[in-house]
């Protein structure tokens, strides 16, 4: 199945990160009339100046809109979905880092679990507010979900029932929430 991306509005979370900024740039430079709505909280876990330099380059594209905000803020996420009505959502935002999850677990619950829940809810309710559903949600998980599996390379069929970090547990939880939402809604 090939997605038609021309003339679509695509929401990319984590747009100031390496993958998010590269994806946004690729879409803006190769797809006709695509509009990218990029969200990032610009937290300082990674170098903020590096994130800002990526955004400077993306702002050169007239079809790029950047919104600074926290996905754990339900009203912020609701406003984004209401105002921009994206047809596609690429969720790359997350509080990253296995070791940091030992020091600041609240950040992982807030960003990774609550934030992703708000994205799922935004997708679910868009049809009511905009008259069209989100056509596709792409979620970026992490190889951390494979924990102590010794078999390489990893496979999607490998067991991932025993995460070894809170970060991995939040990423696996998000996979499960996305699966449940896809079946329920």
Give the residues covered by each predicted segment.
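N-terminal Rossmann-like NAD(P)+-binding domain of SDR-like oxidoreductases, especially those catalyzing
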Residues: 1-185
């Amino acid at each position: 199945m090939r997605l038609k991306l021309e003339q679509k509005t695509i929401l990319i979370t984590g747009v100031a990160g390496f993958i998010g900024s590269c994806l946004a740039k690729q879409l803006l430079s190769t797809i006709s009339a695509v509009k990218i709505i990029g969200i990032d909280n610009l937290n300082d876990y990674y170098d903020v100046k590096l994130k800002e330099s990526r955004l400077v380059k993306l702002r050169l594209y007239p079809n790029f809109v950047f919104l600074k905000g926290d996905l754990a803020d339900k009203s912020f996420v609701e406003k984004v979905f209401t105002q921009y009505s994206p047809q596609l959502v690429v969720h790359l935002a997350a509080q990253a880092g296995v070791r940091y999850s030992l020091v600041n677990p609240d950040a992982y619950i807030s960003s990774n679990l609550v934030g992703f829940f708000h994205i799922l809810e935004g997708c679910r309710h868009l049809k009511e507010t905009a008259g069209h559903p989100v056509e596709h949600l792409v979620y970026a998980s992490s190889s951390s979900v494979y924990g102590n599996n010794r078999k390489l390379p990893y496979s999607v069929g490998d067991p991932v029932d025993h995460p070894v970090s809170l970060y991995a547990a939040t990423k696996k939880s998000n996979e499960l929430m996305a699966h449940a939402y896809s079946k329920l809604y």
